[in-house]
Amino acid sequence: MKNTFNTSNVFASAYSFWGSFIGFILSTSNRLYIGWFGILMFPLLVLATVAYIAAFIFAPPVDIDGIREPVAGALLYGNNIISGAVIPSSNAIGVHFYPVWEALGFDEWLYNGGTYQFVVLHFIFGAGAYMGREWEFSFRLGMRPWIFVAFSAPLVAASAVFIVYPIGQGSFSDGMPLGISGTFNFMLVFQAEHNILMHPFHILGVAAVFGGSLFSAMHGSLVTSSLLAETAGDLSLNIGYNFGQEDETYSISAAHGYFGRLIFQYASFNNSRSLHFFLAAWPVIGIWFTSLGVSTMAFNLNGLNFNQSIIDSSGHLINSWADIVNRADLGMEVMHERNAHNFPLDLA
């Protein structure tokens, strides 16, 4: 008699579990949609958040410049919410991938700023998974895919300052510190070394942010001011609105007529779809351009900068605003990495 083992029940159980798991992951009825990208997103963002909070509070000083002069960024080392930061990885590490097992010990890993790479890489991949999850959820619901396209703007902006710029400059120590004052320091140093304020791509980004804020405020105020009254005068207008109602809740023709007469006729949209596409496209495209500008400057490709001095036919300098900006940049460069070199490369 042969010894036999019936595997059908085992396979059926496995398939049943796997089917239930897939059904739960891909269900659009859950209070929080998970999706395939969510399996990657949730642990990555949790790890990045926990590591960031722990480093912001407890991390020891980091030898950011690679000259054995560590800089403290944690709250327990005397910083406050404004001055605290997760300090970028040491210049001695460069752009090498630096997980904890590459160091001789945990203390050395902390001293060389390994937490910065840990937080940044987990965050970028987690945010990328979030963008993929937006596409996946839209696909499941039969929606058009423009939500994840819009989110690509902040994602590429973060990738530019946290990944592309350090790679282009040859060291993660040139990445943006993860803190408030560290962000401002990064901006000043970036201006000193690249004069980004004079770059047209950065100007497009400024127009995107301030223009987007203006358009958002204009749109919100116009809609709120042209709500259709469905209630008596002594009741709130909000009571007359039912979630999911098919009838429009505000008069776009009234808003269009008001704004067209306030500015001029063609400054106002009479098509709701065109209006909302414009509100989405304006800031997204501008942030794309800014990210492209940062990414090109990462490799010192500054050819689009309008910072050249003006010289007359005799070779004499004609003082201009570009010279004032260049002089200010040199002043900021002198303050940067003050112990790593005596003079900035521009003056050496």
UniProtKB/Swiss-Prot annotation:
Chlorophyll a ChlzD1 binds at residue 122. The chain crosses the membrane at residues 33-50, 122-137, 146-160, 201-222, 278-292. The record marks 165 as: Tyrosine radical intermediate. Fe cation binds at residues 219, 276. InterPro entries: D1/D2, Photo_II_D1/D2_sf, Photo_RC_L/M, Photo_RC_L/M_CS, PSII_D1. Gene3D superfamilies: Photosystem II protein D1-like. The record marks 194 as: Stabilizes free radical intermediate. Pfam families: Photo_RC. GO terms for molecular function: chlorophyll binding; electron transporter, transferring electrons within the cyclic electron transport pathway of photosynthesis activity; iron ion binding; oxidoreductase activity, acting on diphenols and related substances as donors, oxygen as acceptor. It is a multi-pass membrane protein. Keywords: Calcium, Chlorophyll, Chloroplast, Chromophore, Electron transport, Herbicide resistance, Iron, Magnesium, Manganese, Membrane, Metal-binding, Oxidoreductase, Photosynthesis, Photosystem II, Plastid, Thylakoid, Transmembrane, Transmembrane helix, Transport. GO terms for biological process: photosynthetic electron transport in photosystem II; response to herbicide. One of its GO terms (cellular component) is chloroplast thylakoid membrane. It comes from the Eukaryota. It is found in: Plastid, Chloroplast thylakoid membrane. Belongs to the reaction center PufL/M/PsbA/D family. PSII is composed of 1 copy each of membrane proteins PsbA, PsbB, PsbC, PsbD, PsbE, PsbF, PsbH, PsbI, PsbJ, PsbK, PsbL, PsbM, PsbT, PsbX, PsbY, PsbZ, Psb30/Ycf12, at least 3 peripheral proteins of the oxygen-evolving complex and a large number of cofactors. It forms dimeric complexes. 2 of the reaction center chlorophylls (ChlD1 and ChlD2) are entirely coordinated by water. This is Photosystem II protein D1. The gene is psbA.
